[in-house]
Amino acid sequence: MTLRLRSFFAAAALTACTLAQAQAQTWPAKPVKIVVPYPPGGAVDVVTRKMAAALQAQTGQSFFVENKAGATGTIGMAAVAQAAPDGYTLGANDTTWALLPHIFRKLPFDHAHDLVPVSAYVFAPMALVVKADAKYRTLGELVTAGKAGADKVTYGTGGAGTTPHFASEAFGIAAGANFMHVPYKGAGEATMALLSGQIDFQFASTPGVMGQVKGGKLRLLAVSGSRRAAALPEVPTFAEAGVKYAGLINFTGLWAPKGTPAAVIERLQKEIAVAMASPEMKAFAEGIASEPGVWDAATFSRDLAERTVFWGKVAANTAFERQ
């Protein structure tokens, strides 16, 4: 390679680096859309709206949420994958993302490459909730009823193939009980069905139900995790309640289209970290019985890979057929 060519490539690399830095410094220069691939009212929607408000306050630029639900979140995430990779369209999701390869034979995007994990935050236990005046006062009573007769005890979710669906199935297997699944169009709709007495229980991430719990309308029988949630010291874990089922701690996270400048992603990660360190976001997380942590992209990617394997094992032990 001639000296002239070396100088050219060096200058090109320097220019690219300078442009990337400039993008990070000027981003966001216009409103940022965050696609929530589920209906309003669920955990992802609740947490994402709070994060969007925090990012808007920090940057002085508009961050707005667009609900684009359908097909277990794939419609909304496909829209994000097809968006311009400029940092102005992001996608929000939870551990359901790791389920997608196990519930669909073919996805409308490349699950492993078309979307880049940015950061995860607000870590929430999965909780088994019943109506406040439900006849089941303990998890043991619910399990006993489930063992007594197949399909007599019902549970609702935001749809077949969602995290609560698989979490409920895994719980039933661990408990040796039979429960009938009733799918709804979104977690919020399932919660309304629970409140009206149409179903017996619901598996939900705590952000989506704590409002009703605090209002005395719903009651928690158990939470996932190896220890009790700090904000719910009176609620036992599943193991403490007699079922050897640890479950998973859920999260809310953001993804960006493949090709989004690294400098923009790094800026977004920093803004998210600043938001989660604020007293307001910490109080918000604790108020919905969650932990106010934050993961960088590397930790997030590693966890997603582990969850994908975990959900694959759960799917293999259920009667669910890939769509």
State each model region's role.
Residues A29-P31, I173-A174, K214, A239-E240, ...:
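An extracytoplasmic/periplasmic, membrane-proximal ligand-sensing/linker region
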Residues Q23-H113, K152, G176-F203, Q212, ...:
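N-terminal (or domain-start) structured segment
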Residues T96-K106, A170-A174, F201-V235, G312:
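A ligand-binding cleft/hinge motif common to bilobed small-molecule-binding domains
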Residues F123, V209-A277, V309, E321-Q323:
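C-terminal lobe and pocket-closing loops
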